[in-house]
Amino acid sequence: MSKQEEAELILKLYELRREETMRKARDWFFRDFKPQTMADFNNAMFGDHSGHLRMVITYWDMAAALVNDGAIRAELFTDCNGEHVSVFANIELLLPEIRAAYGPQFAASLEKLIDATPDGRKRTATLRERIKGIRETLAKQQAQKA
């Protein structure tokens, strides 16, 4: 694939992220989806935001598959995207249980990309802690306002 074709794929992925329903799904996923248990995950999977959950995870799993299969170079993809790391960090700790319930291929391409990325698992762990700190700070700020 030419560099121009790769660039066009990257831009297409960006354009798809801007679609209205996808934007709402991403907003929900990063703002409100905080699964600590498999019950939390199942509540989302079968609740009002089922479509949002599936849309975000399958979007980034599909994008990862494009990288894993060589349609987009990993270096270019990771230079242009970081959101996939956050998505994986949000489900990583529950992944064995999720796969037991929903099948072994759940987010498999996303995991493969994370594992192929230098320090990929370290990045997800660091990001998970950073997000936890941000949420704690926001909760304190909300409590002070009340």
Regions found by a protein language model. Give the residues of each.
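Acidic, Ser/Pro/Thr-rich low-complexity regulatory regions
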Residues: 1-146
